[in-house]
Amino acid sequence: MLQIKGFRAALLGIFLLSLLGVQLNAKAEKQTVYVIPVEKNVEQGLASFLSRSLQDAKDAHADHIILDINTPGGLVKSAIDMADLITESEIPVTAYVNKRALSAGAYIALQADHIYMAPGGKMGAAAIVDGQGNAADQKAQSLWLAEMEDAAVKNNRDPKYALAMADPDIDAKEVGAPKGDLLTLNADKAIEVGYSEGTADNLSTLVKKLGFEKAQISYAKESFAEKTARWLTNPVIVPILLTIAFLGLTVELFSPGVGLPGTAGLIALLLFFYGHLAAGLAGYETVLLFIAGVILILLEIFLPGGIIGLLGLGAIIASLFLAAGSFTVMAVSLLIASAVSITAFILLTRVLGKRMKFFKKLILNDSTNTESGYVSNQTRTDLMGKVGITFTPLRPSGTVIIDDERLDVVSEGSFTEKDKKVKVIKVEGSRIVVREI
């Protein structure tokens, strides 16, 4: 009997252990790899997308994150924001250089715990430039070189090659970048210098190399709002939007009613602020500052003095810069928009002889003259030619009595004593001119 009970207990133990093994195996099969595309230009819209995607990966309890990188670079501020997000990630991150990680893209790739490259992939050419494509000032370059060096050091990579990507004065001739050239690593050279851990033909191959053969692969996708925000905050689109806005509102000043130019200008402004709000660049306080600026400029029309108008203009410009992802991009955009608007204004006023009709809606332009049929209610034309007696001396103004009515008058120019006869010779509104007779 005891043997039977022991046998049953053994069977039960084996059964429980097999169940536990199934559960452990199921847990292993539930591993998740989260793939986040880092494509096109690096700008604040992409930074916002990365922030949301990293949070989604965390919420999904992902075991690993792969950044699928193919970018020519972009804005330094956005790249630094993205670097901070990657560094703060509690989930291991692998950068997959799927074709190109250039300029700011190379900096982003260096933030990852691991780097793999596709055959033919390239990483580097990370010199910092200004809005016109020229070399940035020394202060900006120094900061950028420090960022590139830190990105390499914190992940145990030789900082020399990161610096050579951003500074042509660094000699890296052993990998094809002598002094005077910026370093761009291909897949083989990246492995040679320890920047890449290997090549992978595609994401599936990479996932296997990372040891997640049975993992579930989830792909982050941009929402419609994120795609729109990225497009509207693109450094090429921003000056176009502001030019349409400024030009449309300028032409509207010469149009009766609310026409197509004004509508187009307002829509362009709305799109500008919507894109920057959705990308996380601007807050509602920025929009309120812009609206306050517009109100102040309208007040300047009714209460001219200059100060209110200048405050309004300052508020509008400040709101645009606060919403901008890059000071340089916004400065260039405003210069372009202002130049086009001023040119249009000169063309309309000097060449075409147009007059601004907008202010006619706000200001009364009717003239009150006798030719237009207006007559003052104080005009005393009925007194013309009448005779009266001076009640006071006229020096040359004084008082006379005409038909028992006391009137304020002025003499023709000479002094006239009291109790003298005078005759009305001219009436101009409320002004009555008399002459002694």
Swiss-Prot record:
Entry's transmembrane regions: 2-22, 231-251, 253-273, 288-308, 316-336
InterPro entries in the record: ClpP/crotonase-like_dom_sf (IPR029045), Membrane_assoc_protease (IPR052165), NA-bd_OB-fold (IPR012340), NfeD-like_C (IPR002810), NfeD1b_N (IPR056738), NfeD_membrane (IPR056739)
Phenotype of gene-disrupted mutants: No change in localization of FloA or FloT.
Keywords: Cell membrane, Membrane, Transmembrane, Transmembrane helix
Superkingdom of this protein's organism: Bacteria
Gene3D superfamilies, per database record: 2-enoyl-CoA Hydratase, Chain A, domain 1, Nucleic acid-binding proteins
Membrane topology: Multi-pass membrane protein
Compartments where found: Cell membrane
GO cellular component, one term: plasma membrane
Pfam families: NfeD, NfeD1b_N, NfeD_membrane
Entries under PANTHER family matching the protein: INNER MEMBRANE PROTEIN YBBJ (PTHR33507:SF3)
Family recorded in the similarity comment: Belongs to the NfeD family.
Name recorded for this polypeptide: Membrane protein NfeD1b
Annotated source species: Bacillus subtilis (strain 168)
